[in-house]
Amino acid sequence: MILLVDAGNTNIVLGVYKDKKYIASWRISTEGNKTSDEYSIQIIQLLNLNNLNPEDVKGIIVSSVVPNIMHSLENMLRRCFGQEPIIVGPGIKTGINIKYDNPKEVGADRIVNAVAAFEIYKRPVIIIDFGTATTFCSVTENGDYLGGCICPGLRISADALFERAAKLPRVELEVPKKVICKNTVSSIQSGVLFGYIGQVEYIVKKMKEEMSDGIEPYVIATGGLANLIANETDAIDEVDSDLTLEGLKILYQKNRE
């Protein structure tokens, strides 16, 4: 049984992989001041609730974009499972060629997604990960990671408007029925959501132009808000909610020996 850990700025996603299939996954809040004891309690309870024995965990891999939780997280994993976790970072075997000016700058989450997309789809891909930040990454059919761009996430964009404009309320991230709205809440939703959709469509268009080699890139979306955006645009070909966990599984298999 393999434990997959994806630590993001907002949530930590945990997955369990056994007998060539996922048998459970959970999402817990990322908290920088949480101790290894607190993480231990959470993860053991989650395993027990799913009738999974912690002693059956034979391998662990971790991807993190939150440096200040890594000490607690690694200590917890070593203590709970008696395993040295594989950490996604410089020196790990990926099977892709990172064509970045400085490959060490590429976030672990982007590497994991790129590996998964390359191994699964076997064609040029654009990966959009809708997280705290939204990342766009391009990978060729030969496994060259070309780079991409990073944008403020959808929630960050909405929260910034609420925090900096005194008379505007915080709103739920819901797509309104029309662009032209007749109340403040719907007007904010229209501007934030449709504006973000337009941003996604334009960035995808420009990335496709720069990747043009005769094969149309396949656009994959993942992350917590992927379905919300994908339902409103033809720029996204597929939503793959398990892309990151799949990438972690692939990287574990490449690096377990």
From Swiss-Prot:
CDD domains according to UniProt: ASKHA_NBD_PanK-III
Give the enzyme's EC designation. 2.7.1.33
Provide the residue positions that the database annotates as binding K(+). Answer: 129
Q: Name the pathway.
A: Cofactor biosynthesis; coenzyme A biosynthesis; CoA from (R)-pantothenate: step 1/5
Quote the cellular component terms of the Gene Ontology held in the record.
Answer: cytoplasm
Q: Could you tell me the superkingdom of the organism this chain comes from?
A: Bacteria
Q: Which UniProt keywords apply?
A: ATP-binding, Coenzyme A biosynthesis, Cytoplasm, Kinase, Metal-binding, Nucleotide-binding, Potassium, Transferase
Catalytic reaction equation(s): (R)-pantothenate + ATP = (R)-4'-phosphopantothenate + ADP + H(+)
What InterPro entries does the record tag this protein with?
A: ATPase_NBD, Type_III_PanK
Q: Does the keyword Cytoplasm apply?
A: yes
Q: Which GO terms describe its biological process?
A: coenzyme A biosynthetic process
Active site as annotated:
109 (proton acceptor)
Q: What class of enzyme is it?
A: transferase
- Provide the cofactor note recorded for this chain's UniProt entry: A monovalent cation. Ammonium or potassium.
* Cofactor requirement: NH4(+); K(+)
Residues binding ATP: 6-13, 132
Q: What does this protein do?
A: Catalyzes the phosphorylation of pantothenate (Pan), the first step in CoA biosynthesis.
Quaternary context: Homodimer.
What family, per the record?
Belongs to the type III pantothenate kinase family.
Under the heading PANTHER family, the entry gives: TYPE III PANTOTHENATE KINASE
Protein name (record): Type III pantothenate kinase
Q: Which organism is it from?
A: Clostridium botulinum (strain Eklund 17B / Type B)
Q: What is the lineage of its organism?
A: Bacteria, Bacillati, Bacillota, Clostridia, Eubacteriales
Q: Which gene encodes it?
A: coaX
